[in-house]
């Protein structure tokens, strides 16, 4: 059971995260700011990471996987300019934080996660948060989730060195794709 003091503390941390990490990075679009202020990041990390949920760094999810730092996620979302009618594929969704944030902006989100335990936890967390426009799909990240597409936007969590053709084929003509390149740069590519 969460105490009022703990809830207030996390709420203050969420506000501080946006004010000190997101806004100073020139991310000022209201839908992104509102979503990041609304989604309880601490609910989408392993319990051992809750106290670090709002730090300005990637959080380890285990197995070499990370939850992107708030600034990086916000910059990617800013570049994608997700609209209210967009269908979004969130690849490597982990415990569901990014999908929850995106769900505030898009008509629907498919959260793809290959780790079955993470996928199950993501689904439970998203349901508990009232995110009824997110589908959690368990499967290989490199395969995408074609049965739910095609997608207006595809976002990849974590670094990749190349984009699998199977994923590119799931992007609508004129759709947007964003990922972090393995050397640390943000890449946004328009296909169509």
Placement of each model-derived feature along the sequence:
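Class I SAM-dependent transferase core
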Residues: 4-89, 97-101, 105, 118-128, ...
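Conserved nucleotide-cofactor-binding alpha/beta core module
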Residues: 81-191
């Amino acid at each position: 059971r969460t105490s009022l003091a703990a809830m207030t503390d996390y709420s203050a941390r969420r506000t501080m995260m946006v004010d000190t990490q997101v806004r100073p990075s020139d991310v000022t679009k209201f839908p992104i700011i509102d979503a990041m202020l609304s989604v309880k990041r601490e609910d989408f990390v392993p319990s051992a990471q809750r106290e670090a949920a709002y730090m300005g760094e990637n959080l380890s999810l285990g197995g070499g996987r990370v939850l992107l730092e708030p600034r990086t996620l916000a910059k990617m979302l800013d570049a994608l300019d997700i609209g209210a009618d967009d269908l979004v594929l969130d690849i490597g969704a982990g415990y569901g934080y990014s999908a929850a944030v995106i769900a505030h902006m898009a008509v629907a989100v498919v959260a793809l996660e290959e780790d079955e335990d993470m996928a199950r936890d993501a689904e439970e967390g998203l349901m508990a948060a009232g995110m009824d426009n997110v589908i959690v799909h368990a499967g290989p990240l490199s395969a995408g989730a074609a049965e739910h597409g095609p997608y207006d936007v595809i976002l990849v969590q974590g670094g990749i060195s190349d984009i699998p053709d199977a994923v590119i084929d799931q992007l609508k003509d004129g759709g947007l794709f964003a990922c972090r390149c393995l050397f640390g740069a943000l890449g946004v590519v328009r296909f169509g």
